[in-house]
Amino acid sequence: MTYLLVFLGGGLGAMFRHFINTVSGRMLGTAFPYHTFFINVSGSLVMGLIAGYFAFKGGSSQHVRLFLMTGILGGYTTFSAFSLDAALLYERGAVGLAALYVLGSVALAIAGLFAGLALIRAIT
């Protein structure tokens, strides 16, 4: 049942993401990645709202959390999970580890992308 909830939520999140990509491209153009910027910021905002609500106003079932946070937000943007992880490290007092996580994730993700591009260029 949990996999089905994540699957269904992920599909909805991906549809929302595609909608934002399409609309922002038409409205703002494609010279700057407004769509990704908006998705990352809005997804992180919603993750904060949901996580904060569950933490401060009372929990909810694991099924609801999986559907909303892992499913919908995971399909919409994984940046929200990244932001939550960084915030949790910071709030636990692991400021240095949070900074390392943020800088390392961004730098290694970009390096990984360039490595993938270089590899595919080399073999094609």
Swiss-Prot record:
Keywords: Cell inner membrane, Cell membrane, Ion channel, Ion transport, Membrane, Metal-binding, Sodium, Transmembrane, Transmembrane helix, Transport. Na(+) binds at residues 74, 77. The gene is fluC. The keyword Metal-binding applies. It holds the Pfam family CRCB. This is Fluoride-specific ion channel FluC. One of its GO terms (molecular function) is metal ion binding. Belongs to the fluoride channel Fluc/FEX (TC 1.A.43) family. It catalyses: fluoride(in) = fluoride(out). It is found in: Cell inner membrane. Its main location: membrane. One of its GO terms (cellular component) is plasma membrane. One of its GO terms (biological process) is cellular detoxification of fluoride. It comes from the Bacteria. The chain crosses the membrane at residues 3-23, 36-56, 66-86, 100-120. Fluoride-specific ion channel. Important for reducing fluoride concentration in the cell, thus reducing its toxicity. The keyword Acyltransferase does not apply. Na(+) is not transported, but it plays an essential structural role and its presence is essential for fluoride channel function. It is a multi-pass membrane protein.
